[in-house]
Amino acid sequence: MDRDEMWARANSHPMPWDMIIIGGGATGVGVAIDAASRGYDVLLLEQHDFGKGTSSRSTKLAHGGVRYLGQGNIGLVKDALRERGLLLQNAPHIVREIPFIVPNYDWWEAPFYGLGLKLYQLLAGKYGLGTSRILSRDEMLRFLPTLKTEGLRSGTVYYDGQFDDARLLIHMVATAYEQGAVLLNYVEVIGLTKSDAGTINGVKARNMETGDEIHASAKVVINATGAFSDNVRRLVDPNASSMILPSQGIHLVLAGSFLASGSAIMVPSTRDGRVLFAIPWHNHTLVGTTDTPLDNATLEPVAREEEIDFILATAGEYLATRPTREDVLSVFAGIRPLVRAKSKSTTAALSRDHVVHVDQSGLISVMGGKWTTYRHMAEDCVDQAAVMGELQQRPCITPGLPIHGSAGDPQTRSTLSLYGSDAAKIRQLIRDDTKLGELLHPMLPYLRAEVVWAVRNELARTVEDVLARRTRALFLNARASVAIAPVVADIIAAELHWQQSVRDKHLSSFNDLAANYLLS
């Protein structure tokens, strides 16, 4: 994928587009895949990088949502379990099945959670994974040798999906591109245009790198900006009521030795009513999450001290080695774009159902939902958009549409396995220049070749793009990422022909950002 080529296409494309999508997270890119694969002309604009917001900051789970069973939302769980199955089918190089263990310390927990998780398994139907069952104390410790043993009676095992969110997203961008969509990062929508009848018929947008502007018309404009959906709606109506209730969740990343296992821990009920996970991820341990209501969404949310303390304390109740602040390699925060529901008193109680909302102006906003259900959200949105835009009705094909790279061997678990079929091309880069086969840092699994690949083929434009989202270095080890940032900046500078001052500016910006991921 080449950004300059897509910018040229955006400028020369005959007007109007069938659909213009604002927002380059999982929802927006999912809509682009669905619409383009139906044969519609699609332009997607993202003012920062793909996945800069919520979509790179999830708990990395492709799951039905165990806690929604407790809320009685059987429909949501069943739908999400189907979508989990489709993700495993269509992106086997990125999404995988792993065991989750529920430790039982009271006599009633084994039958209670065992029954609930059996229902969870049954709701998946033909998309089910492994069989859930009750484990003895000894079996528990074989699954999770680092589990706290004091008072441990038994456990329950069930199976769910895990993935790398930002890696899946960039492969989704490539999928949409292959289906004919034009997708541009670092292009900000600065205004919406209206017809004489007062309906939205296009956008004004600015290329953040060059300052150039374009006016693009469309039969339908779709707002897929997640936690920032209300901001876009207010470009049309400054007095539009809020539909999004943002909630912050944080995650801590620890060394892999805290789990020393390919299995995850699931704590069904924490003090704030959420589920807490400790998950093996890229040979590290990911622990989260919290639920902190926010007044406003921010692009770069920061973990609060009380959230950090809560995660450490709760994890310490289940792990044999109690983690401390000194053990935290990285901390990151994400914002859930929950749709407001007046009858709910806490964000932890809100559902993750999605909404496709049409303003009087004709602006379509797709809101809510969660990562696992992005495909279904997109299908519903495109169905509505086709009606609004008076487009020819065409069936959705995404249930069986493979995600870019899926032709690779999902059984191969090398450092490049997440690239799927692209891994062979990265290995060719290394054969052409053996220096590219060097690790960027001994504590991280990433190669110099991955930086080159990200810039040449995955629309990476900054040091942050590479270290936060094309690789996950910043999320795995913030201090190591700061150490390798100058080398990464040099590689990008050579690829994009940056002047020294531009290189230094990008490096400084990344170092400022990385400070938010460090505890000490």
Q: Where are the predicted features?
A:
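Short hydrophobic core segments
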Residues: I21-I22, A216-G226
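C-terminal accessory subdomains/tails of enzymes that are appended
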Residues: P16, I20, H48, I94, ...
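Extreme N-terminal leader/targeting segments of oxidoreductases
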Residues: M1-M19, D34-R38
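Core beta-strand elements of the Rossmann-like FAD/NAD(P) dinucleotide-binding domain
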Residues: P14-W17, T210-V220
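A conserved short coil-to-beta-strand element within the FAD-binding core of flavoproteins
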Residues: N185-N201
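N-terminal Rossmann-fold NAD(P) dinucleotide-binding loop
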Residues: G28-V29
